[in-house]
């Protein structure tokens, strides 16, 4: 799989991250260096590659300051598979709950989707042509061939005793007799209309594969593995649905693209991508740190830490696509560490996060920058949303400053949730406008400090109300 983004220099990576994330320059520099080191490693000899392991990162800082966003944007820059997991969701081996290896399986699932999406894009035109041909046949059906009764009457168990193997995969309903000249003429007309986009809302009956998740078992990770194995062994069940042509085209294009790509090759490439480029973000790692205040919980927390340790050190994990080596994956741990400290992690785990970065709490000035500087800042998002109703919203600089001050103050007075506070502040302030917007086309609304205070001051100055509403 192509990952040209990995050739970006650390300066380029920081510049790209600055388009979406305000401040936290130290954290950006460290993840940029970690990313560049992956590119440097790819240029080494095979012998040298085996000796160079990624330097895992531990991010320390309160919620809402950009820990997850920095990691997610970094992964997106280079097309690397990325997942975020919470350390508190895992339990020690032998207890009910998710085991730590599930994070690796989830990462491989993401890698498989990335690789297959890229391969599907290469055969998109061919798949769409096949989908259009199929749609023409659905819109102008011909006579179906009679089913072969001998094949349908086969006992599935015969294959175990030397009998013929029933062909579950083939759908005899798709086979048709040679179309008549009249049908050919009609199909030619319909095909032209289809390509011109004249039949997008016409309904067709289509057989689609039923999502295995809809029939799956709920419960432990072992049950999920069993379900995955059963889904691979059993023939895929199809259900008939009536859908518009535009929806049917998407479904059929995806099915034909799946048939056109080599699934086995895609799976192997995905495993390699996960091994060499995978990024696992372990949030709330501070919650499994032990501070010797509650010995009962400490035992369980230490168990989770010890289970995570072999994954970080490098181990072989079985997935439904094959065996995956975690040795060269990049792990980013993150936590607020309000109650515990990084030194409360077991020493072996501390050693697996050699790069430490402390993210700063956000100031009023940071909030102002977050509202205005990013490529698609919150202000720009709300302006664009209301513009769809022909309502023009204009924020003055003073109003933006006032919003930032209120967000900062509410964070100080209640729980500090960082930049996420801006979402609740803006949503509350624009609630009435969003509700009335459809009935006020071509309106121009100026958001001034007075407007902000009218909507928010009574709430922001009342600590009890702000704790519940903002």
UniProtKB/Swiss-Prot annotation:
Which molecular-function annotations from GO does this UniProt entry contain? ATP binding; ATP hydrolysis activity; peptidase activity; proteasome-activating activity
For this UniProt entry, what is the primary localization, expressed as one broad class?
cytoplasm
Q: Which family does it belong to?
A: Belongs to the ClpX chaperone family. HslU subfamily.
Q: Which Gene3D superfamilies match?
A: 1.10.8.60, P-loop containing nucleotide triphosphate hydrolases
Q: Does the keyword S-adenosyl-L-methionine apply?
A: no
Determine the domain of life of the protein's source. Answer: Bacteria
One Gene Ontology cellular component annotation? HslUV protease complex
Q: Which SMART domains match?
A: AAA, ClpB_D2-small
Quick one: which residues bind ATP?
A: 22, 64-69, 283, 348, 420
Would the keyword DNA-binding be found if you checked this record's keyword annotation?
no
What's the protein called, per UniProt?
ATP-dependent protease ATPase subunit HslU
Q: Where in the cell is it found?
A: Cytoplasm
Q: Which InterPro entries match?
A: AAA+_ATPase, ATP-dep_Clp_protease_ClpX, ATPase_AAA_core, Clp_ATPase_C, HslU, P-loop_NTPase
The record describes the protein's role as: ATPase subunit of a proteasome-like degradation complex; this subunit has chaperone activity. The binding of ATP and its subsequent hydrolysis by HslU are essential for unfolding of protein substrates subsequently hydrolyzed by HslV. HslU recognizes the N-terminal part of its protein substrates and unfolds these before they are guided to HslV for hydrolysis.
**Alphabetical GO biological process terms:** protein unfolding; proteolysis involved in protein catabolic process
> Which portions of the sequence form the region Disordered?
145-187
Q: What keywords were assigned to this record?
A: ATP-binding, Chaperone, Cytoplasm, Nucleotide-binding
**A Pfam family that the UniProt record links to this protein:** AAA_2
Q: What quaternary structure, including any partners, is listed in this protein's UniProt entry?
A: A double ring-shaped homohexamer of HslV is capped on each side by a ring-shaped HslU homohexamer. The assembly of the HslU/HslV complex is dependent on binding of ATP.
């Amino acid at each position: 799989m192509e990952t040209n983004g990995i050739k970006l220099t650390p300066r380029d990576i920081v510049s790209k991250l600055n388009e979406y994330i305000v401040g936290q320059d130290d954290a950006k520099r460290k993840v940029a260096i970690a990313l560049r080191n992956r590119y440097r490693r790819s240029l080494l000899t095979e012998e040298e590659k085996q000796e160079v392991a990624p330097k895992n990162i531990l991010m320390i800082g309160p919620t809402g300051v950009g820990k997850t966003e920095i990691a997610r944007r970094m992964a997106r820059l280079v097309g690397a598979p990325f997942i975020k997991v919470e350390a508190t969701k895992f339990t020690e081996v032998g207890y009910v709950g998710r085991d730590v290896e599930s994070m690796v399986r989830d990462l491989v699932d993401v890698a498989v989707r990335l690789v297959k999406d890229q391969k599907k894009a290469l055969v998109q035109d061919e798949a769409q042509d096949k989908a259009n041909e199929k749609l023409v046949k659905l819109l102008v059906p011909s006579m179906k061939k009679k089913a072969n009764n001998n094949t349908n009457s086969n006992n599935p168990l015969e294959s175990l005793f030397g009998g013929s193997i029933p062909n579950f995969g083939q759908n005899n309903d798709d086979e048709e007799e040679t179309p008549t000249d009249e049908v050919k003429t009609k199909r030619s007309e319909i095909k032209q209309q289809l390509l011109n986009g004249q039949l997008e809302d016409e309904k067709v009956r289509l057989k689609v594969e039923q999502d295995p998740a809809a029939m799956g078992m709920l419960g432990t990770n072992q049950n999920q593995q069993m379900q995955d194995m059963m889904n691979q062994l059993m023939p895929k069940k199809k259900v008939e649905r009536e859908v518009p042509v535009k929806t049917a085209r998407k479904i059929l294009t995806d099915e034909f693209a799946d048939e056109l790509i080599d699934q086995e090759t895609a799976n192997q490439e995905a495993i390699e991508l996960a091994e060499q480029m995978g990024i696992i973000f372990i949030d709330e790692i501070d919650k499994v740190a032990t501070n010797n205040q509650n010995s009962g919980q400490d035992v369980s927390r230490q168990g989770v830490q010890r289970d995570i340790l072999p994954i970080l050190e490098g181990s072989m994990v079985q997935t439904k696509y094959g065996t995956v080596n975690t040795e060269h994956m990049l792990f980013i741990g993150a936590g607020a560490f309000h109650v515990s400290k990084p030194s409360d992690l077991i020493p072996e785990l501390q050693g697996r996060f050699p790069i430490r970065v402390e993210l700063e709490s956000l100031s009023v000035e940071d909030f102002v920058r977050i509202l205005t500087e990013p490529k698609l800042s919150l202000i720009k998002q709300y302006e664009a949303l209301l513009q769809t109703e022909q309502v023009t919203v204009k924020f003055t600089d003073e109003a933006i400053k006032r919003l930032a001050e209120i967000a900062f103050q509410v964070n100080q007075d209640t729980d500090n949730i960082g930049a996420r506070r801006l979402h609740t502040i803006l949503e509350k302030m624009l609630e009435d406008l969003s509700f009335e917007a459809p009935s006020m086309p071509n309106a121009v609304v100026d958001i001034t400090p007075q407007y902000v205070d009218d909507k928010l001051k009574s709430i922001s100055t009342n600590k009890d109300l702000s704790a519940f509403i903002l």
